[in-house]
UniProtKB/Swiss-Prot annotation:
<keyword id="KW-0067">ATP-binding</keyword>
<dbReference type="InterPro" id="IPR001341">
    <property type="entry name" value="Asp_kinase"/>
</dbReference>
<dbReference type="GO" id="GO:0009086">
    <property type="term" value="P:methionine biosynthetic process"/>
</dbReference>
<feature type="active site" description="Proton donor">
    <location>
        <position position="683"/>
    </location>
</feature>
<dbReference type="InterPro" id="IPR036291">
    <property type="entry name" value="NAD(P)-bd_dom_sf"/>
</dbReference>
<dbReference type="GO" id="GO:0050661">
    <property type="term" value="F:NADP binding"/>
</dbReference>
<keyword id="KW-0418">Kinase</keyword>
<dbReference type="InterPro" id="IPR045865">
    <property type="entry name" value="ACT-like_dom_sf"/>
</dbReference>
<feature type="binding site">
    <location>
        <position position="799"/>
    </location>
    <ligand>
        <name>NADPH</name>
    </ligand>
</feature>
<comment type="pathway">
    <text>Amino-acid biosynthesis; L-methionine biosynthesis via de novo pathway; L-homoserine from L-aspartate: step 1/3.</text>
</comment>
<keyword id="KW-0028">Amino-acid biosynthesis</keyword>
<dbReference type="GO" id="GO:0009089">
    <property type="term" value="P:lysine biosynthetic process via diaminopimelate"/>
</dbReference>
<keyword id="KW-0457">Lysine biosynthesis</keyword>
<feature type="binding site">
    <location>
        <position position="612"/>
    </location>
    <ligand>
        <name>Na(+)</name>
    </ligand>
</feature>
<protein>
    <recommendedName>
        <fullName>Bifunctional aspartokinase/homoserine dehydrogenase</fullName>
        <ecNumber>2.7.2.4</ecNumber>
        <ecNumber>1.1.1.3</ecNumber>
    </recommendedName>
</protein>
<keyword id="KW-0915">Sodium</keyword>
<dbReference type="GO" id="GO:0009090">
    <property type="term" value="P:homoserine biosynthetic process"/>
</dbReference>
Amino acid sequence: MKLLKFGGTSLANAEKFLSVSSIIEENTQTDQIAVVLSAPAKITNYLVKIIENTIKNNQILETVHLAENIFMQLINNFLNIQSNFPHKEIEKIIKKEFNELKNIIQGILLLKQCPDNIRAIIISRGEILSVFIMKSILQSKNYNVTIINPVKNLVAIGDNYLDSTVDISESKKNIQNMNINQSNIILMAGFIAGNKDKKLVVLGRNGSDYSAAVLAACLDANCCEIWTDVDGVFTSDPRKVPNARLLKSISYQEAMELSYFGAKVLHPRTIEPIAQFKIPCLIKNTNNVKSIGTLICEQNCSEKDFLKGVTHLDEIAMFNISGPHIKDVGSVISRIFTMMSRGNIKILLITQSSSENKINFCVYEHDIYKILYLFNKEFQLELKDGLLNPFKIKKNLSILSIVGSNIYKKHNIASKIFSVLGALKINVIAISQGSSKHSISLVIKKENILKAVQHVHNTLFFNKKTIHMFLIGIGGIGSTLLNQILKQKQFLDKKNIEIKICAIANSKKILLLDNTNDLSNWKNDFKKSTQKFNLELLNNLIKNNHFSNSVIVDCTSSQLLSEQYVNFIDNNFHVVTSNKKANTSEWNYYKKIRKSVAQTGKKFLYETNVGAGLPVIETLQNLFKSGDNLICFKGILSGSLSFIFGRLEEGILLSQATREAKELGFTEPNPCDDLSGIDVARKLLILARESGYNIELKDIKIEPLLPNNFKIYEDTDKFLLKLKELDVYFSNKIKQALNVGNVLRFVATIEQKRQFFIKLEEVNINNPLYKVKNGENALAFYTNYYQPIPLVLRGYGAGNNVTASGVFSDLLRTLS
């Protein structure tokens, strides 16, 4: 025996009714089939609306006609699809049902209310008509059909007309006494049962699924299939978490936990009978019959797939009960549970403080006023005598739950969850582990639940580490960085690293990207973008940031942008920058950035500020962490000047060498910054501050390469033209040095007596800076550990490729 249950969306029209009949036919080849049917989609909602409109005496007949027309249109469509369908017979049944409904409505109009027993009769009409229609379809295909009347055979416990529970033992006896022919297809309306007086009652929310589970138990079915409009149970709601995965199988206990904490596929009551009688339950999709679905069974899940889902409940309120004189907290909890049970109120989660004088529990917000009334009545004396404090209520909360087999045995699950929430700046208000040890639940603000679910899910179910990158500046460095990221995609995929480019901007406009954008075509997409860029837009993007690992990448030389770094960091962004302006601003701002980093746990990475792709900053920081101290520093910190002076040695004129350096991407946007020495001074300032010196840019003495009276042009072409006036002067200086076996180098120096200066020096062949040219940088650190031979870092210190690679490296360091 196999039981099949079909939901309302599977019966929404004539075509879907026939699809369901085909599924039933196919299954009859191997098993006897019992079928439980819901009302067609929308019908139950219309029937509820009929009751509401009747009580208000508003648009009654219009709503009745809407519901009736769904059925009439449905059976009319059968005429075009299946010629032998008994259209007239079913039409009579439908009209009879709706005529009876209209008579019932007259009684409601007189009473101006709808008793529960009448409400149950009205809202269950859809299921009954579904059975009549399916019976006619199957009989027209020459199948023998037996209809089980749930009012006569499913025995409801108690007198609740709208949310009954079935006595499976008694119901089983009734159904066995029917002696149903084994060759017949069994049909039964879902959602319905009968009380001890054989009066119709309904089974509450998701009652048709519950009916199916009950009937499966009564028939000793070897399988229960729930056919719906989704492929099965997912690791999270696919509408909210697009990369949620279909679960092939889950245990009864896991299914119970998932449904209890918000998963929509099955109601906990549905799982109870199939778990009790160990009936495997398969969730299938009528719109995708080839999908394997999800099997719910007794077998424990494999160790590999111990995590099963991330789900949530919304519209939650948390009550806080406390008092300085609670002597017996167990008694208080007992009274709370008794009181809530009497009021038919569900406690979703409960926690108790270690001091045993405070209890928190969560309920649905719609129960708040009912609870307050019951509490004030139950604890009237304790409140009056000050033994209990006035109750505190927190609203607008959600419960985030993580479900899996023996989740408590996995020591790193909680740490991963808290790490994600911490990165998102989401505070956990309460935490609880289910008594079944199959779930962990956390209470957070409702406004944070969507991003919490998405990021916790992605962290737990995917090993992939994600960076959400906002790139500002797409000149030489920025565009090269994008090309490097594209080139390294396969390598990053192997390392389970994903870099998502969320925005690309320059000083004029911004391109916002999503997962559908093809990054290989970013230049054309950027040209087409019409959205103007400004700091206000950027700040709005930042405030609405829902990502756990977001990075602002600054590849500009903008002072204004650098002044926003504290704001970026405080709003949950890492900052990676090739822009030296922030680190060379006033000391107070320099410290303010680092204070924000310390407070937020975000990263501020600027390796390229001094040596482009050379590991200068990290090396220096690691030296100091290990207890070393700087004694003296000598370095060539300008790749552009390294290139220029190398070319001068080869007989190239200054103006020509400078133009070549700019064309190769070695210089700043205006080469004047390089030749003035100010760019080197900024780098030396950064090194000095990293070494513990509290200094400003003005404390660095610069002996400029350019004469004091040399006119500076902001226009690059004019500046390079003007530079020709110095060609002969520098050619002569180079020759003088070479004549005595020396070379000219523009050297930055830190000496122990707080001496910081930059000047053009002659260096001999024994100096570590002697052979440095062609765009190389060289940094010689004399420290307690490295003397008399210094620690020397040497390599290309300018150029788009090496600088972009340094930024790329910093970007990846945000994951550590």
